[in-house]
């Protein structure tokens, strides 16, 4: 059983810069073999700012800074109040989009919003490896190769090792499909993963 409260806001302070956020909290009753627990659960509530700037008629610079917040916990124990989510700078044009920073991998993005329980205790991340958000990240998304089909490629470089993730994504009308590949070792390279994402 769960009661979910979701509140979103977006405040446009300039033609190409937006402040936004979402509070997503559920009241959950969890019955397990060890105990029965009723508690408020934060489901990736967040705040952020994003914007874009036209460098030319065919070239755009964009950015996003996004942090997870937990309205159910005042963090009196000294834990971080904010947890970094997708935070990056990107340049896009006829060639596609090139971006760097902290971001979901191509494999993670290949969900294509089919995870109906995303951000909750029943998130697909608990049964499927590859729900990774990495820093030291460089990503590329191609323009459509054919109608509705593009490629996403990204890589990371860290002191613990390197990794790559790639996906073919198809989206047209009501049909969506994706084929993604990511080494299992990516999970061990993982630099950051939010509690529910």
Predicted regions, residues:
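N-terminal signal peptide c-region/cleavage motif recognized by signal peptidases
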Residues: 8-10
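Outer membrane beta-barrel
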Residues: 16-28, 36-160, 168-176
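Conserved adenosyl
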Residues: 163
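Conserved small/polar residues in nucleotide/adenosyl-binding loops
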Residues: 187-194
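Active-site beta-loop-alpha junctions enriched in small/polar residues
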Residues: 156, 182-184
């Amino acid at each position: 059983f769960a009661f979910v409260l979701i509140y979103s806001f977006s405040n446009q302070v300039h033609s190409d810069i937006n402040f936004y956020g979402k509070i997503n909290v559920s009241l959950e009753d969890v019955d397990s073999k060890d105990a029965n627990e009723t508690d408020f659960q934060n489901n990736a509530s967040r705040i952020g700012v994003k914007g874009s700037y036209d460098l030319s008629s065919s070239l755009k610079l964009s950015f996003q800074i996004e942090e997870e917040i937990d309205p159910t916990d005042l963090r009196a124990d000294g834990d971080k109040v904010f947890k970094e989510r997708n935070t990056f700078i990107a340049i896009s044009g006829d060639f596609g989009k090139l971006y760097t920073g902290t971001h979901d991998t191509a494999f993670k993005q290949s969900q294509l919003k089919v995870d109906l329980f995303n951000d909750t205790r029943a998130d697909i991340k608990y049964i499927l490896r590859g729900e990774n958000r990495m820093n030291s990240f460089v990503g590329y998304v191609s323009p459509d190769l054919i109608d509705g089909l593009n490629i996403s490629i990204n890589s990371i470089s860290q002191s613990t090792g390197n990794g790559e993730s790639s996906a073919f994504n198809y989206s047209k009308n009501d049909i969506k499909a994706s084929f993604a590949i990511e080494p299992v070792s990516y999970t061990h390279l993982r630099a950051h993963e939010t509690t529910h994402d």
